[in-house]
């Protein structure tokens, strides 16, 4: 354990639900998304009429919103922020990573993340990312089930550089 983590006050943040700055525009990436205009609206819960849990409702919390809250968090004694996934994904929880090299545009830009880290550090706060590197979403540049990415995904070809990342029972239709 790093010495700076011993005795730390850690605050976990689910970025979409933490604070909306109003600085990050909502890009149109998926026709099935629901954007909650009112911060106090109830989030969607449970499966839809087909029994599928979509995780497709967004409240617009973003990285600049987190940065705006840093003085408040520092005042609480927080010295470590644990951020749930921030990489591009299709769900609000972002555990279905689409691209590990891109900050989800719903949360902001790489520059927004850089500013957040610099501002946090200036207040004595460290940032820990929840890096989900043991799985991706099926709609990712690595699996590319729907063909939305330019890269050759494991679902599309056994020649994909990412093919070995996945376990197929019967390629391509059956996978774990």
Regions found by a protein language model. Name each.
Residues 9-14:
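Mature N-terminal segment immediately following signal peptide/propeptide cleavage
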Residues 1-3:
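Extended acidic/polar, glycine-enriched regions
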